Curated annotation (Swiss-Prot):
Family: Belongs to the actin family.
UniProt xrefs under PANTHER family: ACTIN
PROSITE patterns membership: ACTINS_1, ACTINS_2, ACTINS_ACT_LIKE
Pro-piece positions: 1-2
Protein name in UniProt: Actin-1
GO cellular component annotations of the record: cytoplasm; cytoskeleton
Molecular function terms from GO: ATP binding; hydrolase activity
Reactions listed under catalytic activity: ATP + H2O = ADP + phosphate + H(+)
Main subcellular location: cytoplasm
Gene that encodes the chain: act-1a
Organism: Onchocerca volvulus
Function (record text): Actins are highly conserved proteins that are involved in various types of cell motility and are ubiquitously expressed in all eukaryotic cells.
UniProt entry keywords in alphabetical sequence: Acetylation, ATP-binding, Cytoplasm, Cytoskeleton, Hydrolase, Nucleotide-binding
The protein's enzyme class: hydrolase
Amino acid sequence: MCDEEVAALVVDNGSGMCKAGFAGDDAPRAVFPSIVGRPRHQGVMVGMGQKDSYVGDEAQSKRGILTLKYPIEHGIVTNWDDMEKIWHHTFYNELRVAPEEHPVLLTEAPLNPKANREKMTQIMFETFNTPAMYVAIQAVLSLYASGRTTGIVLDSGDGVTHTVPIYEGYALPHAILRLDLAGRDLTDYLMKILTERGYSFTTTAEREIVRDIKEKLCYVALDFEQEMATAASSSSLEKSYELPDGQVITVGNERFRCPEALFQPSFLGMESAGIHESTYNSIMKCDIDIRKDLYANIVLSGGTTMYPGIADRMQKEVTALAPSTMKIKIIAPPERKYSVWIGGSILASLSTFQQVWISKQEYDESGPSIVHRKCF
């Protein structure tokens, strides 16, 4: 790295995982849970030089004695003190950089409240003294990562799902739909249906085990009813999973019943439309002239779109809703778990982007509201 060329930092703060690294890299250097843990009981670890809080993987590994909290709920920061701890951990422990020496690109959920963008801006400039920063919308970055500037992004992470139509690089706010159904809800639902099978998972620590079961064994059925029939008549769909204590459990139709809730939110007692219908509804809120371009560029993004079978099922469901002659294409990049971060890395390393950063000087002159003028 030559001296005059300082790499920008790219931090994608998800509800479940924080992805961080350097602009120009093709993958994030650090990926850790967006968790802050505090000891449940005072002084149980005598002589351990006990800290009053733990972040990320360390909180995860000590989860037995901690109470875990996620500062980002449904994609939006709700606890700023904890959020600051996560950023501090990102810069100093994970990336090992001095934030006052690097421009920082942060990501935000679509329709993020204005006050939140201002608070992010304020913390970056006042707490971390960054020389420059920018806030980009997550779904737009995913679209860039797929090499497009027009399309509709179905972005589903741990805390929230959005359908975001984007035309020539601009998100169309009137047509963005938010669905408060994502990975965390699916983990909770899997906990519930495994309980019905006689396995008990209740604590925050056990929830992480169920999340692992979900990530390793779940898939989306192309035809739910048919899959249920197959599961009932044979054991061909059953898989076993070994718990940390050595006990082995069997998972059957739960494997596809869990992510089916994405298409049928009524499974979770929610009245909202499924992800296929939300995608369709979002497209229908757009100008009739651009719908064709959106149908042909449906881009999946985020960890909750990683289930095997989800792209085929989306293709089938959207085709059933759309006009019969419409060409429909679902794009599911293999790296879509990190495509928001990758898009940020691409954006922050473009030469044309360098004049777009909000500088410390601009912030000092205008205050936090500068973010609304500079970041669309």
